[in-house]
Amino acid sequence: MLPRGIRNNNPLNIRRGKSQWQGLKAQQTDASFCQFESLEWGWRAAFYLLTRTYYINYRLYTIRKIISKWAPPNENNTEAYIQNVSRLTGIAPDETIGIPTIDAARWIAVGLAMAIQENGLSKREQNDACISFAEREDGRPKVNGPDSIDIFALLRGWTLCRQDG
C-alpha cells in the first residue's frame, strides 16, 4: 500500500487546520491530514509552508530549525529526521539553506528529503528518489511508480508556489 502522504497527494503530511489551501479535495476523508487533488497542489502547499511560513514568518533558515518545528520531539524522533534530511541533501543541519528565490535547488532538495522521511521510504526507495531527482543511469527520468516520488509533480508544485508572488 502506498504511504499515507502519497495517497493524500500530500508529500509532507500537512495537517488539517484553518488554511484553505489551493487544490484541496472538496471531500476530506482523512481526519488528520490534508488531501489534495494532485501531487502538484500538495507540493505547492509544502513549498509555501517551507519558503514563506517557515523561512519568512518564523525566520527558520536551517534544516535543524525547520524540522524541530515541523516534527517536534513530542511526536517524532526529531534528531533522526534532521540527520536523514541532512544526509540526503548534503546540507549540514545547522548550515543556512539559502534564500528560496536564489537557492531554489537547495529548497527543492530539502522538500524532497522531507517527503522521503515523511513517507517512510526504504533505503532503496530513497536512493531511487534521489537518482530520479536528476536522472537515472540510462539517461531517462524516473517517473512515478510504486517506489518513487513524482519529481515532475514536485517541480510543478515549486513553480505554482513561486507564481503566487
Give the location of each predicted region.
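Cell-wall polysaccharide-cleaving catalytic domain and substrate-binding groove, primarily
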Residues: 1-165
